[in-house]
């Protein structure tokens, strides 16, 4: 299941990275709200 191009692979990784950052940010905000 190789990507069509290196650019497509980069975009896929970027989207996953963005999602991870968003989740970490949300958990950080939520933990601050509960304190």
Swiss-Prot record:
Tissues expressing the protein: Hemolymph.
Record key words, sorted: Hemagglutinin, Lipid transport, Secreted, Transport
Induction (free text): By bacterial infection.
GO biological process entries: lipid transport
Function: Assists in the loading of diacylglycerol, generated from triacylglycerol stores in the fat body through the action of adipokinetic hormone, into lipophorin, the hemolymph lipoprotein. It increases the lipid carrying capacity of lipophorin by covering the expanding hydrophobic surface resulting from diacylglycerol uptake. It thus plays a critical role in the transport of lipids during flight in several species of insects. Has hemagglutinating activity towards rabbit erythrocytes.
Organism classification: Eukaryota, Metazoa, Ecdysozoa, Arthropoda, Hexapoda
UniProt subunit comment: Equilibrium between a soluble monomer and a bound lipoprotein form. Apolipophorin-3 associates with lipophorin during lipid loading until each particle contains 9 or 14 molecules of apolipophorin-3.
Protein name, per record: Apolipophorin-3
Disulfide bonds: none
Transmembrane segments: none
Keyword Transport carried by entry: yes
Family the entry assigns: Belongs to the insect apolipophorin-3 family.
Subcellular location: Secreted
Assigned GO CC terms: extracellular region
